[in-house]
């Protein structure tokens, strides 16, 4: 009996070591591609388009499918909710499909909606509730989504082939033609606590900026002095994806907040909202892949510029322009920032700062620009 017990303990220990090793290897694969500790390595409901079970969530159309970190394209069918604010300041709902699980961080639920890492609010699926299957067109080699999506005209079925499993497929009608596209089977996702959407604003800011405020910007670093800046009861709280950033804004406060990615999972670059007589507009969400070092460097530069009305020292080259001082084109890995300081006629006070941020998203190297004006 003692010997049998020892054998069982040895086998259990070996199995545990195997699980830990698999988690470490998979996590390394995630870190090398996504720098993200967010996604669980077990119990994933995601499945690759080739029918393989994902180790973690479906991120940017991709998930880990082996202990060695092999990646496959994958899909989700969770609904997202995009809230837009057109010029009339009327909130409108627009539904899209998520490409990742609907994630909540005790703030608002969000998910990734395209191959570049754009995020939206999302609607967690209720238990046992069925969602329509989402069809995604794949490239000629059948390995990469082209970006075109639609709904299936037939049921999403698992389709093996002579060469091996090809995963789930459905028939899609395109005009008078029919084609077979990859599709996502309906996952059953237990939803987190559903938050309220009061004062929720736009998450459509990766290509849209309208920075304008009559208030001074609050700057913080590390454990910030504003205790509610990372846990806001109204408005959109700090969110992050892929190891760095999304801005935070509320109805009454503006923040540019940096948190060291080595110490905390949140690394945020917040460029603020505007409160006017009509109401509050959540106007900017910026996103980029950055490192702790680049965040620290960028923070010091911004702190020099925005924390003091005088011209900063050591920010880099300065060029006198028609309307002020051009400070830029510094590049921090995938971030490029340019600032133009506008001074009043007496040239003694800073009136405004124009900001031009460019972000590269993920492996796809898509450039987005974010421009705006900060009125001090």
Swiss-Prot record:
Keyword annotations of the record: Signal
Signal peptide: 1-22
Family per record: Belongs to the ascovirus HvAV ORF17 family.
The protein's name in its UniProt record: Uncharacterized protein ORF17
């Amino acid at each position: 009996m003692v010997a049998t017990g020892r054998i069982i303990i040895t086998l259990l220990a070996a199995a545990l070591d195997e699980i830990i090793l698999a988690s470490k290897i998979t996590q390394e694969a995630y870190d090398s591609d996504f720098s993200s500790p967010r996604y669980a390595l077990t119990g994933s409901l995601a499945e690759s388009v080739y029918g393989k079970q994902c180790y973690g969530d479906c991120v940017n159309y991709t998930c880990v499918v082996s202990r060695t970190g092999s990646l496959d394209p994958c899909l989700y069918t969770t609904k997202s909710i995009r809230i837009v604010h057109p010029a009339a300041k009327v909130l409108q709902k627009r539904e899209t499909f998520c490409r990742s699980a609907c994630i909540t961080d005790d703030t608002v639920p969000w998910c990734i909606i395209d191959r570049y890492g754009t995020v939206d609010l999302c609607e967690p699926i209720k238990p046992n509730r069925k969602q329509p299957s989402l069809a995604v067109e794949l490239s000629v080699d059948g390995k990469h989504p082209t970006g075109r999506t639609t709904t299936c005209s037939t049921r999403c079925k698992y389709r093996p082939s002579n060469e091996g499993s090809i995963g789930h497929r459905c028939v899609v009608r395109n005009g008078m033609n029919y084609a077979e596209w990859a599709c996502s089977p309906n996952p059953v996702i237990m939803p987190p606590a559903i938050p309220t959407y009061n004062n929720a604003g736009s998450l459509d800011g990766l290509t849209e900026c309208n920075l304008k405020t009559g208030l001074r910007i609050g700057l913080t670093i590390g454990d910030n002095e504003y205790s509610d800046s990372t846990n806001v009861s109204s408005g959109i709280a700090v969110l992050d994806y892929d190891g760095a950033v999304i801005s935070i804004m509320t109805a009454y406060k503006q923040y540019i907040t940096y948190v060291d990615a080595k110490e905390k999972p949140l690394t945020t670059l917040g460029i603020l909202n505007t409160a006017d007589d009509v109401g509050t507009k959540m106007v900017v969400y910026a996103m980029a892949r950055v490192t702790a070092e680049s965040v620290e460097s960028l923070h010091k530069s911004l702190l020099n510029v925005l924390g003091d009305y005088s011209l900063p020292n050591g920010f880099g080259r300065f060029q006198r322009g028609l309307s002020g001082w051009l400070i830029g084109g510094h590049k921090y890995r995938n971030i490029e920032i340019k600032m133009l300081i506008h001074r009043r006629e007496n040239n003694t006070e800073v009136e405004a700062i124009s900001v031009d941020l460019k972000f590269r998203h993920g492996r796809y190297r898509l450039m987005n620009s974010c421009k705006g004006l900060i009125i001090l």
